[in-house]
Curated annotation (Swiss-Prot):
<feature type="modified residue" description="N6-acetyllysine; alternate">
    <location>
        <position position="16"/>
    </location>
</feature>
<feature type="modified residue" description="Phosphoserine">
    <location>
        <position position="3"/>
    </location>
</feature>
<feature type="binding site">
    <location>
        <position position="58"/>
    </location>
    <ligand>
        <name>O2</name>
    </ligand>
</feature>
<dbReference type="InterPro" id="IPR050056">
    <property type="entry name" value="Hemoglobin_oxygen_transport"/>
</dbReference>
<keyword id="KW-0479">Metal-binding</keyword>
<feature type="modified residue" description="N6-succinyllysine; alternate">
    <location>
        <position position="16"/>
    </location>
</feature>
<feature type="modified residue" description="Phosphothreonine">
    <location>
        <position position="134"/>
    </location>
</feature>
<keyword id="KW-0349">Heme</keyword>
<keyword id="KW-0813">Transport</keyword>
<comment type="subunit">
    <text>Heterotetramer of two alpha chains and two beta chains.</text>
</comment>
<dbReference type="GO" id="GO:0020037">
    <property type="term" value="F:heme binding"/>
</dbReference>
<dbReference type="InterPro" id="IPR009050">
    <property type="entry name" value="Globin-like_sf"/>
</dbReference>
<dbReference type="GO" id="GO:0005344">
    <property type="term" value="F:oxygen carrier activity"/>
</dbReference>
<feature type="modified residue" description="Phosphoserine">
    <location>
        <position position="102"/>
    </location>
</feature>
<dbReference type="GO" id="GO:0019825">
    <property type="term" value="F:oxygen binding"/>
</dbReference>
<dbReference type="InterPro" id="IPR002338">
    <property type="entry name" value="Hemoglobin_a-typ"/>
</dbReference>
<protein>
    <recommendedName>
        <fullName>Hemoglobin subunit alpha</fullName>
    </recommendedName>
</protein>
Protein backbone atom coordinates (compact mmCIF):
# COMPACT_ATOMS: atom_id res chain seq x y z
CA UNK A 1 0.00 0.00 0.00
CA UNK A 2 1.33 3.38 -0.95
CA UNK A 3 1.50 5.92 1.86
CA UNK A 4 0.57 9.56 1.34
CA UNK A 5 4.29 10.34 1.10
CA UNK A 6 4.77 7.59 -1.50
CA UNK A 7 1.90 8.96 -3.58
CA UNK A 8 3.34 12.46 -3.42
CA UNK A 9 6.80 11.17 -4.41
CA UNK A 10 5.41 9.18 -7.34
CA UNK A 11 3.33 12.09 -8.63
CA UNK A 12 6.25 14.51 -8.31
CA UNK A 13 8.74 12.14 -9.94
CA UNK A 14 6.44 11.26 -12.83
CA UNK A 15 5.58 14.92 -13.26
CA UNK A 16 9.26 15.68 -13.83
CA UNK A 17 9.42 13.00 -16.52
CA UNK A 18 6.88 15.03 -18.46
CA UNK A 19 7.13 14.85 -22.22
CA UNK A 20 10.03 12.40 -22.00
CA UNK A 21 7.84 9.56 -20.69
CA UNK A 22 7.66 7.76 -24.03
CA UNK A 23 11.40 8.07 -24.61
CA UNK A 24 12.08 6.80 -21.09
CA UNK A 25 9.68 3.90 -21.69
CA UNK A 26 11.50 2.98 -24.90
CA UNK A 27 14.89 3.24 -23.21
CA UNK A 28 13.70 1.00 -20.38
CA UNK A 29 12.52 -1.57 -22.92
CA UNK A 30 15.88 -1.45 -24.70
CA UNK A 31 17.65 -1.94 -21.35
CA UNK A 32 15.39 -4.90 -20.62
CA UNK A 33 16.02 -6.52 -24.01
CA UNK A 34 19.79 -6.09 -23.60
CA UNK A 35 20.01 -7.11 -19.95
CA UNK A 36 17.42 -9.87 -20.06
CA UNK A 37 17.46 -11.26 -23.62
CA UNK A 38 14.76 -13.86 -22.94
CA UNK A 39 12.24 -10.99 -22.79
CA UNK A 40 12.66 -10.58 -26.55
CA UNK A 41 10.59 -13.72 -27.11
CA UNK A 42 7.40 -11.72 -26.56
CA UNK A 43 8.28 -9.39 -29.43
CA UNK A 44 9.20 -11.69 -32.35
CA UNK A 45 7.58 -9.35 -34.86
CA UNK A 46 9.45 -6.25 -33.60
CA UNK A 47 12.62 -4.69 -34.88
CA UNK A 48 14.41 -4.58 -31.52
CA UNK A 49 17.40 -2.55 -32.67
CA UNK A 50 18.30 0.68 -30.89
CA UNK A 51 15.88 3.47 -31.75
CA UNK A 52 13.44 1.32 -33.73
CA UNK A 53 10.01 2.80 -34.31
CA UNK A 54 8.36 -0.31 -32.85
CA UNK A 55 10.28 -0.09 -29.58
CA UNK A 56 9.54 3.64 -29.40
CA UNK A 57 5.83 2.99 -29.96
CA UNK A 58 5.71 0.29 -27.29
CA UNK A 59 7.70 2.51 -24.94
CA UNK A 60 5.00 5.14 -25.40
CA UNK A 61 2.33 2.54 -24.54
CA UNK A 62 4.23 1.65 -21.37
CA UNK A 63 4.53 5.34 -20.49
CA UNK A 64 0.84 5.97 -21.18
CA UNK A 65 -0.16 3.08 -18.92
CA UNK A 66 2.09 4.38 -16.14
CA UNK A 67 0.74 7.90 -16.57
CA UNK A 68 -2.78 6.49 -16.22
CA UNK A 69 -1.70 4.56 -13.13
CA UNK A 70 -0.15 7.68 -11.56
CA UNK A 71 -3.48 9.42 -12.10
CA UNK A 72 -5.35 6.61 -10.35
CA UNK A 73 -3.10 5.70 -7.43
CA UNK A 74 -6.13 4.94 -5.27
CA UNK A 75 -7.63 2.54 -7.83
CA UNK A 76 -4.86 0.81 -9.76
CA UNK A 77 -6.96 -2.35 -10.33
CA UNK A 78 -9.75 -0.33 -11.93
CA UNK A 79 -7.40 1.81 -13.99
CA UNK A 80 -5.36 -1.13 -15.29
CA UNK A 81 -8.06 -3.82 -15.59
CA UNK A 82 -8.11 -3.93 -19.41
CA UNK A 83 -4.31 -4.02 -19.56
CA UNK A 84 -4.25 -6.83 -17.01
CA UNK A 85 -6.72 -8.82 -19.13
CA UNK A 86 -4.63 -8.24 -22.26
CA UNK A 87 -1.35 -9.39 -20.72
CA UNK A 88 -2.87 -12.36 -18.88
CA UNK A 89 -5.26 -13.78 -21.44
CA UNK A 90 -4.09 -12.68 -24.88
CA UNK A 91 -0.36 -11.94 -24.66
CA UNK A 92 0.37 -14.40 -21.83
CA UNK A 93 3.44 -12.54 -20.68
CA UNK A 94 5.43 -14.29 -17.95
CA UNK A 95 4.79 -12.27 -14.77
CA UNK A 96 8.51 -12.04 -13.97
CA UNK A 97 8.92 -9.74 -16.96
CA UNK A 98 7.01 -6.97 -15.21
CA UNK A 99 9.61 -7.02 -12.43
CA UNK A 100 12.41 -6.89 -14.98
CA UNK A 101 10.86 -3.94 -16.80
CA UNK A 102 10.22 -2.20 -13.47
CA UNK A 103 13.91 -2.54 -12.62
CA UNK A 104 14.89 -1.12 -16.01
CA UNK A 105 12.46 1.77 -15.56
CA UNK A 106 14.03 2.62 -12.20
CA UNK A 107 17.51 2.57 -13.75
CA UNK A 108 16.35 4.78 -16.62
CA UNK A 109 14.66 7.29 -14.31
CA UNK A 110 17.70 7.41 -12.03
CA UNK A 111 20.00 7.98 -15.02
CA UNK A 112 17.94 10.86 -16.38
CA UNK A 113 16.88 12.46 -13.10
CA UNK A 114 19.78 11.89 -10.68
CA UNK A 115 19.13 15.02 -8.61
CA UNK A 116 15.54 13.97 -7.96
CA UNK A 117 16.18 10.27 -7.45
CA UNK A 118 16.90 10.20 -3.73
CA UNK A 119 16.38 7.09 -1.57
CA UNK A 120 12.85 8.13 -0.60
CA UNK A 121 11.75 8.67 -4.21
CA UNK A 122 13.49 5.44 -5.24
CA UNK A 123 11.60 3.49 -2.58
CA UNK A 124 8.27 5.11 -3.51
CA UNK A 125 8.72 4.43 -7.23
CA UNK A 126 9.77 0.86 -6.48
CA UNK A 127 6.62 0.31 -4.40
CA UNK A 128 4.48 1.93 -7.10
CA UNK A 129 5.94 -0.25 -9.86
CA UNK A 130 5.56 -3.35 -7.67
CA UNK A 131 1.88 -2.45 -7.17
CA UNK A 132 1.42 -1.96 -10.91
CA UNK A 133 3.09 -5.34 -11.54
CA UNK A 134 0.83 -7.01 -8.99
CA UNK A 135 -2.26 -5.58 -10.67
CA UNK A 136 -1.05 -6.60 -14.13
CA UNK A 137 -0.51 -10.19 -12.96
CA UNK A 138 -3.65 -10.43 -10.80
CA UNK A 139 -5.72 -12.08 -13.53
CA UNK A 140 -3.23 -14.86 -14.19
CA UNK A 141 -4.72 -17.02 -11.45
Amino acid sequence: VLSAADKANVKAAWGKVGGQAGAHGAEALERMFLGFPTTKTYFPHFNLSHGSDQVKAHGQKVADALTKAVGHLDDLPGALSALSDLHAHKLRVDPVNFKLLSHCLLVTLAAHHPDDFNPSVHASLDKFLANVSTVLTSKYR
